[in-house]
C-alpha cells in the first residue's frame, strides 16, 4: 500500500497567513516552538534550528556543533535565497514509521508535529530514513512540482530532524548533523 501523495498535496494546499501554529507541540519527545512569523527563513532559523542547536550544546555537543551551527544560523537567509513558500499545513514528522494502512487499505498518518511551513519539509523528511516508493514522489510532483533549489533546501530541512535525533539518541546523529552543517556551510562559500 502506498501512502497517497495526492492526499498529502491536498493537505499542503491548506494555507495560513503565517508560518507556525497556534500553540507549541512536540517533535518526538522534544518540545517544538511554533510561534508564528511572516518570514519562513526567520521561522525555520528561530523556531526550528536555533532551539535544536541550543539543546545539542546543552546535551554535550558544543565542541562538535556550536561554532559551525552558529555560522549556519547566520546563513539561513542566504541558503533559502528568494524562496518564499506559502505556509502549508504540514504533518511535521512524516516518515515511513508514521503512516500505515487500515484493513481496507486506506492510508492513515499519525504522530504529527503539525505547523504551517514550507511543504518541502514534509517531502524532505520522507526521504531522510529510507524514503517512500519512487512512485510516491512522482505522483506528488505531478500534482505539486518541487521548485528550483529543493535539493539544497532538503539538506537544510532535514538537519532539523537529525539534530533532534542527536538530542534524543546521541552520538552518531550528532556527527551526521556536523557533516550536514559542513556541507551547508560549503554551499554558502560557493
Question: Model segments located where?
Answer:
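Alpha-helical elements of Rossmann-like donor-binding domains used by nucleotide-donor carbohydrate transfer enzymes
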Residues: 3-10, 71, 75, 135, ...
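Short helix/strand-capping connector loops at secondary-structure junctions
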Residues: 156-165
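Active-site Asp-x-Gly
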Residues: 34-45, 54, 83-89, 96-155, ...
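Phosphate/dinucleotide-binding and metal-coordinating scaffold of catalytic cores
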Residues: 3-6, 68, 83, 131-134, ...
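A cross-family kinase active-site recognition segment
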Residues: 1-63, 86-87, 116
